Amino acid sequence: HVGDSRLYAIRAGRLLVQTRDHSQVQLMLEQGLIEPDDVATHPARNRVYSCLGGNLLPEIEFSRKTPLKAGDVIALCSDGAWAPFTDDTLVHALATTSPAHAVPKLLNLAEVAAGKHCDNLTLMAMQWEEGNTVQVDKTEAMANTENTHMPIQPEQNSQ
């Protein structure tokens, strides 16, 4: 992962793994300069030292391998989607209902909580299932992109 987007792994209703933010407040917290209760309101809470699209190459951090079990929930979200909630609230919402129901509800709550200062909201979640291999037809997959923005293709140089 990179920056302050987070990956959560949830097993049996409990947080199994959470990635470490690449932010100034995370470093300050690890160094004992601030308390955990200060993180959400600290003036530097949105300053990241590694990100995609910045002037410098990102510091990509690979988490330790964690074997998944049937029923585990994996969620990847931007800071706009996780910041309005405590980790316990986010974990509870994703652990007690299907991701298909939890994700839209969490995004709506995050948007309302942020108000006119709403950051980008991205939250993707899935529940792991054992032994089910699914083949998806490319045409079928592409037909389900009505709310997805396709990447802009670079122009080809005609020289």
Regions found by a protein language model. Give the residues of each.
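"…together with the soluble PPM/PP2C metallo-phosphatase catalytic core" -> "…together
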Residues: V2, Y8-K69, C118-A125
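C-terminal catalytic subdomain
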Residues: S50-C77, A81-Q159
